[in-house]
Amino acid sequence: ALQTLAVKMWTGKQVTTPYDSFNEQRNLLSEAPGVNQLGRIGKAPGLVYEQAAVTPNRTLPYREIGYNYLVSFDIKGADEAKGTELFRSPDAVFYLSDPISGMLGFARDGYLNTFNYRIMPGEHATVGISGDNRVTRLHINGKIVEELNIQKRFYNGGKDSMNYVRTLVFPLQETGNFKSQITNLKVYRQ
């Protein structure tokens, strides 16, 4: 949206490109030299990164992937301590076992969001996390099992409310100290 606002605020005169065409073309622009706040990987939708095996305590080539993504991997679960991280970046953490309940989850901006799903020791599964600017989804073996979408939260004795948006720019920079076997990591830009 920033590109659209910039055009309107700079001049807004003699706009000859229809909005739909402009909106499509603006996504091809970079944010600024050396900046990637949107977490873009690759130029087009499709598979943008893959790794046969993910090992603990490693640095990966990308910091994160931004909205409209799918990250999938195969897992053979092990007994993970609460707080076990799978991936992290400076902005977020994705947990194999969150620090409170031991479920799959993620933390960002000081908030912990958990899925109602735990990887059990010995369990074989294909896990997928997909996200956009409104919702983060958990896929298990190709099926969506939970969606963390916008919640209305009330405060001031219920008189006021705000929307809590449970989204995630998926962290990829570093792997955690986990025991489970993680293979077939695939990152898609959708």
Go through the PLM ranges and name each one.
Residues 71-73, 123-140:
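Short tryptophan-centered beta-strand motifs in secreted/extracellular beta-sheet-rich domains
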Residues 46-105:
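Extracellular glycan-recognition modules
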Residues 1-56:
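Flexible, acidic glycine-rich loops studded with aromatic residues
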Residues 109, 139-146:
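Short strand-turn-strand beta-turns centered on an Asx-Gly dipeptide
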Residues 76-80, 134, 177:
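Short solvent-exposed strand-capping/beta-turn motif centered on an Asx-Ser/Thr pair
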Residues 58-63, 113-119, 157, 171-173:
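Beta-strand-rich interaction surfaces with strong enrichment in secreted/lumenal proteins
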Residues 146-184:
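Flexible glycan-contacting loops in extracellular carbohydrate-active proteins
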Residues 105-126:
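Short, aromatic/His-centered strand-loop micro-motif at the edge of beta-sheets
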